[in-house]
Amino acid sequence: DGTAIMRILDIPPGREVGEAYQFLLNLRLDRGPMDAASAEEALRAWWAARP
């Protein structure tokens, strides 16, 4: 959820939270259900790779 995304990425509410949420939704559609640790790792990698 958005609160967890903000905590993990240490970001305030805003557009980036929605983008991260969409990334996780797409990831789940592509890969199927993931455990929390794998999802967090993917989220952090996605965030670090952003321009």
Task: List the model feature ranges, each with a label.
Residues 1-51:
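Charged substrate- and nucleic-acid-binding regions of tRNA-handling and nucleotidyl-transfer enzymes
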